[in-house]
Regions:
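Thiamine diphosphate
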Residues: 1-169, 173, 308-309, ...
Length: 326
């Protein structure tokens, strides 16, 4: 039986990177403050001391340059982990990511690859309008990129380990409010495959399809609903591209109702793609229209009371599901 240990989301990510650097001499980490400082969110703390400045590399504040160097290094046979402090700053590098990193393999006729792992953060945490955005849909829209958003320490380590073995570029999006969350995971290396959702809670009355921090909101709401005899199934997709449509459809065919719960905006967001596919592929099984809950369509306020109002929470999800089942 595998021994399980308790570890935070932050430390699980760090262990995945430590194992990769020990295992693969071509692996390097690069980004703003990742070395001496240990990362803005302390995810790389201690790795500079263990592996040195040649493998844990502090860069200038130049996101386009970070991704360009990482892409070139990957094309040359290295395995770079490029940290972009927040997904908001990834917009500065979007030309490199979308027009170079994502397309190298196809444009070279399959003879060249750029297996870069781009770690970044998304989500809210009193960081105001320009530092709290969720742009996962922008990157999930692009063929050639893998996009993942883990919700637990187990998934964070397993998916990052898989990313380090991948021969394709990976956008690895962490949530700023999950770094301190603890969870159980096995000792040593393990992988969580891309494109495989995890049913975090079994249920029969309704399916919530979600990911990242909203998984925890869904689980808490489901726990409260269970006290009233309502059994909600929670499907954490874990990766957005590729997305595990089979698990989603199997759940909806069982429960006959679906709520898509995300932290991005509703218009042209992830929730719309998932809802459309459910409505198309599982239409005959639905007892009610597919519903969506997302962030309010406003630039996010800094004030904590206004920020809280902009997002779904357990109480809002609870009320929405009661309405859907009425």
């Amino acid at each position: 039986m595998t021994d399980l240990i308790q570890m935070t989301y932050r430390d699980a990510l760090k262990e995945a990177m430590r194992e990769a650097l020990r295992r693969d001499e071509t692996a390097v980490i690069m980004g703003e403050e990742v070395g001496v400082w240990g990362g803005t969110y302390a995810v790389t703390r201690g790795l500079y001391d263990e592996f040195g400045a040649q493998r844990v590399i502090d860069t200038p504040i130049a996101e386009m340059g970070i991704i360009g160097v990482a892409t070139g290094a990957a094309m040359g046979g290295m395995k770079p982990i490029a940290e972009i402090m927040t997904i908001n700053f990834a917009l500065v590098a979007i030309d490199q990511i979308v027009n170079n990193t994502a397309k190298i393999h196809s444009m070279f006729g399959g003879t060249m690859r750029a297996p870069v792992v781009i770690r970044t953060t998304a989500g809210w945490g009193q960081l105001a309008a320009t530092h709290s955005q969720s742009f996962e849909a922008w990157f999930a829209y692009v063929p050639g990129l893998i996009v993942v958003m883990p919700s637990t320490a187990y998934d964070a380590k397993g998916l990052l380990t898989t990313a380090m073995y991948s021969q394709n570029p990976v956008i690895f999006i962490e949530h700023t409010r999950l770094y301190g969350e603890k969870g159980e995971l096995p000792k040593g290396e393990f992988r969580v495959p891309f494109g495989v959702a995890d049913v975090k809670r079994q249920g029969k009355d309704l399916t919530i399809v979600t990911y990242s921090r909203m998984t925890h909101v869904a689980l808490n709401a489901a726990k409260d609903l269970a006290q009233q005899g309502i059994e909600v199934e929670v499907v954490d997709v874990r990766s957005l591209r590729p997305l595990d449509w089979a698990t989603i459809m199997n759940s909806v065919r069982k429960t006959h109702r679906a709520l898509v719960l995300t932290e991005d905006w509703m218009t042209f967001g992830v929730s719309g793609e998932i809802a459309a596919r459910i409505a198309h592929d599982a239409f005959d099984y639905l007892d009610a229209p597919v519903e969506r809950m997302t962030q309010a369509e406003v630039p996010l306020p800094y004030a904590p009371n206004l920020e809280k109002m902009a997002f779904p929470d357990e109480a809002k999800v609870f009320a929405k599901i009661k309405e859907m089942l009425a």
